[in-house]
């Protein structure tokens, strides 16, 4: 939720600024309302019936399918994904990835890296994913190549938990 849509519930000045400087969609749709299947649709360009990823609990994404990161990579782009994957498989078609297994945790979350090691990182997941993404862009990518970085945040998923310092932000509302 963003206050540029309804100011009664939240205060989001930075997101509101981005919305006022860019495009804000008042009527938009997704191919699937669940995060994993929706992500599979975006990656493949196919509906769930075509990519065979129907739900968040019984499906495993078939990484042999064509995806837009694979096409970009084949055409000289450096590709990366950092954050929530939730496709019950490991990413394919990326030069770099570090993903949150399953739904992930808001506080001190685990990440799986390209060596298939699970590493617990201390902090709030939004800040960690953001900082890891900035670090990859500034320090790890090949600056001679165009790039595509998918930054998949957890914090848009229930249950919604803020950073510890913001837990009392709306106590009086």
Regions found by a protein language model. Give the residues of each.
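Formylglycine-dependent sulfatase
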Residues: 1-173
């Amino acid at each position: 939720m963003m206050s540029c849509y309804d100011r009664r519930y939240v205060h989001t000045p930075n997101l509101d600024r981005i919305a006022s400087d860019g495009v804000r969609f008042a009527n938009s749709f997704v191919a699937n309302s669940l995060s994993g299947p929706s992500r599979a649709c975006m990656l493949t360009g196919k509906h769930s019936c075509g990519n065979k990823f129907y739900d968040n609990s019984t499906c495993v994404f078939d990484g042999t399918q064509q995806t837009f990161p694979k096409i970009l990579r084949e055409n000289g782009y450096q590709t990366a994904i950092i954050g929530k994957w939730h496709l019950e498989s490991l990413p394919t078609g990326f030069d770099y990835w570090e993903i949150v297994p399953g739904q992930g945790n808001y506080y001190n979350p685990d990440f799986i890296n390209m060596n298939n090691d699970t590493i617990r990182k201390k902090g709030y997941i939004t800040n960690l994913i953001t900082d890891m993404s900035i670090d990859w862009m500034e320090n790890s990518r090949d600056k001679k190549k165009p790039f595509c970085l998918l930054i998949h945040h957890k914090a848009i998923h229930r249950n919604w938990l803020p950073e510890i310092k913001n837990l009392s932000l709306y106590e009086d509302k």
